Amino acid sequence: MIMNPTAIKHVVVDGHSLTLESFVAIARYNATVELAPSALEAMKKSRALAEKIAAEGRVAYGITTGFGEFQKVAVPKEMSNQLSTNLILSHCTAAGEPYADEIVRGMMLLRANALCGGVSGVRPILVEMLLEMLNKGVTPVVPQKGSLGSSGDLAPLAHMTLPMLGKGEAMYEGVKMPGAEAMAKAGIKTLDTLVSKEGLGMTNGTCAMTSVGALALYDSICAAQLGDVIASMSFEGLTGLRNAFDPRIHQVRGQKGQMLVAANMRKLLDGSEILDNCQKDRVQDAYALRCIPQLHGACRDALDYVREKVEIELNAVTDLSLIHISEPTRHAQIS
């Protein structure tokens, strides 16, 4: 079962407690968001260590080195900011029709939530800006084609970042316009540049595919729930035999989804005057009626499995590199 996301009006983003319902409430139904104080402190510590690593010249991927095949190239501290900004600009290579606003809003939320984990070494202002854009309705225009998938939704996330730099395009109040104009109309100050590590921090994640998947999962769960309602109407119209939903039958089978659907069918058909008053001239129905719990239940079990994996990914940090803080010395370990 799933609760109604429209009942969720406000969500505190902390990096670890996002649910499918709260995700949909923000991405699709425009629930407001705020940054958890604990996440703010974690990001401040992480950023301080990233700056320390850069100042010491330690070898750390994406902080003091280039990217990909250029990982062995040392990057001088004075060039690290430009390198981060260039990473965004160079990866804006997606093509095709733009994603729906709800998918892009989901991407923004997931990127902010991942950065709230406090292991990416970025400034809190990036998360604060993403959340402000969500609250004020500035949605970057992000083309659908061109992601690397599990290696990172690099191109979609680069396009998502452009309006934060006063570039690209965005939707605001239902109108597509230059990103700088949308941000100005919403009263959001843009950034002149990113700083070291932030190019990777904004792009190295699975936020696009997870946003698409989470919204599809929510719609699939809703469809499964409606499937039981439709099945009950068919069952009633064909004057089926309700003993097929006897809980004892499904308890000895032990399948969670099957038991759930059988209970739902009993509830939906309880008090049916048609079934109470019809003549029974058979001992069992056709498979299509008596096996509704087995069929629908298998779908419910599959959706439960997918939900478990999606909700892990909603709160996952998929950045590279990661800065792990060892308390109380606050020594940084890079992975």
List where the protein language model places each region.
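Active-site cavity-forming subdomains of large catalytic enzyme subunits
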Residues: 92, 96-100, 104-255
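N- or domain-start disorder-to-order transition segments that initiate the globular core
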Residues: 4-57
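Single conserved hydrophobic/aromatic residue that forms the stacking wall/gate
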Residues: 323-335
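Acidic, low-complexity proline/glycine-rich segments
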Residues: 10-20, 184-203, 264, 268-279, ...
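Glycine-rich loop at the start of a catalytic domain that most often binds anionic cofactors/ligands
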Residues: 69-84
